[in-house]
Amino acid sequence: MAKTNTVQIKLVSTADTGFFYVTKKNAKAQTGKLEFRKYDPVARKHVTFKEAKIK
């Protein structure tokens, strides 16, 4: 079988609330770290989420 290109990653809130999203990315196409502005329900506002490895 062929190796899959997609890997699961964790998007961790930069507001230090401990909230995170789990998503997938294409490891070959996206070589850098992902960074999104998404809603953090703990902080109740949109903040930057940065990519981290799932342990």
Curated annotation (Swiss-Prot):
Signal peptide: none
Gene Ontology cellular component annotations, sorted alphabetically: cytosolic large ribosomal subunit
PROSITE patterns per UniProt: RIBOSOMAL_L33
SUPFAM superfamilies (UniProt xref): Zn-binding ribosomal proteins (SSF57829)
Alphabetical keyword list: Ribonucleoprotein, Ribosomal protein
One of the protein's GO biological processes: translation
Positions in coiled-coil regions: none
Disulfide bonds: none
Domain of life (superkingdom): Bacteria
A molecular function (GO) term: structural constituent of ribosome
Family statement: Belongs to the bacterial ribosomal protein bL33 family.
UniProt-recorded name of the protein: Large ribosomal subunit protein bL33
